[in-house]
Amino acid sequence: MLTDPIADMLTRIRNATRVYKESTDVPASRFKEEILRILAREGFIKGYERVDVDGKPYLRVYLKYGPRRQGPDPRPEQVIHHIRRISKPGRRVYVGVKEIPRVRRGLGIAILSTSKGVLTDREARKLGVGGELICEVW
């Protein structure tokens, strides 16, 4: 039994990028789809689509990589360098608008679940709302 499906999704994405997979499948939910929508809009993934695998709904996440590097390691640059769950089932983390962290001085994003929906840190600051700090990505 999974106790934290969001952490499972982030781990699947992290593991797939480390071995340069083109895509990975995660069990579908509306909340996960909202997180993936933000990751796609911010340029961390190519996109995603709903698929059925053995009659069960999944989200197929298409991962994104940068150009191939020069030198002895010709693998492409990873777009997602770090993806980490912050608020967990055992320790929820809520922040007000003034406590929303700036991830890597604005180069990364924090994803929050707010009363206005699932938002990035910049959107939440702009709207003046706080919420549950789901994860950070850079």
From Swiss-Prot:
Superkingdom of this protein's organism: Bacteria
Keywords linked to the UniProt accession: Ribonucleoprotein, Ribosomal protein, RNA-binding, rRNA-binding
Protein name in the entry: Small ribosomal subunit protein uS8
A molecular function (GO) term: structural constituent of ribosome
Statement: the UniProt record of this protein carries the keyword Electron transport: no
Function: One of the primary rRNA binding proteins, it binds directly to 16S rRNA where it helps nucleate assembly of the platform of the 30S subunit central domain. The combined cluster of proteins S8, S12 and S17 appears to hold together the shoulder and platform of the 30S subunit.
GO CC field: ribonucleoprotein complex; ribosome
InterPro entries: Ribosomal_uS8, Ribosomal_uS8_CS, Ribosomal_uS8_sf
Example GO BP: translation
PROSITE patterns: RIBOSOMAL_S8 (PS00053)
UniProt cross-references to HAMAP family, sorted A to Z: Ribosomal_uS8_B
Upper taxonomic lineage: Bacteria, Thermotogati, Deinococcota, Deinococci, Thermales
